[in-house]
Amino acid sequence: AYGIMIMLQNTDSVDILIVADPNEKFEERDKLFIDQYIMNGGKSLWCIDPVYANLDSLSNGFSTIAFERDLNLRDLLFRYGARLNADLLQDVVCMQYPVNTAPAGQATNWVPAPFYYSPLATPSPTHILSRNLNNVMVEFTSSIEAVGENSELRKSVILSTSPYARSIQTPVEVSLLSATNPPDQRFFNQPNIPIALLLEGKFQSAFQNRMTEQMGIQRSEVVKSSPDNKMIVIADGGIIKNKARVRNGQVQLQPLGYDQYSKQTFGNRDFLVNCIDYLSDDSGIMQLRSRVVKLRLLDKVKIRDQKIKWQLINT
């Protein structure tokens, strides 16, 4: 709490507060200083995993249990207009990871298989922040909702699933076997589930009616409403995290958004840079960058379902 207090006491010294994949509960005093930083005009980027699950947990076996992670942030983010849900998203448009398909006792046979818990998220094509970006690689991501009745806030979805996704409530068993024994794709009937929200306008303090003296601020000193401000909330903690690999006994960081299996680089870095530039009010750079058109992934579901139709047409 002391470090956060010192860092945020002078709003001018912190351009953007990035809350990147925290794994411990926030104390109320920490939340108060973050809240007052925002009420004084401070910009913020939240990358939060509301559910605990990761691939490392699967490295020691074929399955693990994903469960809700209590970071004590729900009331704060709810007050600002966002609710992170304790679910996991599956998407037909997803990453492929090597899976051993050999029977027990036989030589390993690694083949690429879709891992539905690692969606290739779609940036919104209608907002300058996310327009013309490549798909973004996420992993064990959750859904997010715009909430509240604050008429002074504008809420925009800037990242979502493909049209072929579904939400699974936790706790739930996560298994690598789903890659080799996939669920019926008719269950993937929830389109464009939001993953990231941009919130703009005047935020209301989560502490405006609370006793704050024991947390270091007199109640009369609590700023109750912010000036025009911005924040981004993402329901994925690892979206801005570089992946690492061990090679010759050395840990090597991969470029942000790079997938070592497909050798592709996805839009994570560009998405992060755009978030920072947008929060920094660098609209000129945003306008220029949004003119760059990049290739998008083909709709693999439609390709598969309509393959025979187009083969017949072209013969």
Walk through the language-model features, giving the residues of each.
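A cross-kingdom feature of multi-pass membrane systems that activates on extracytoplasmic/periplasmic
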Residues: 289-299
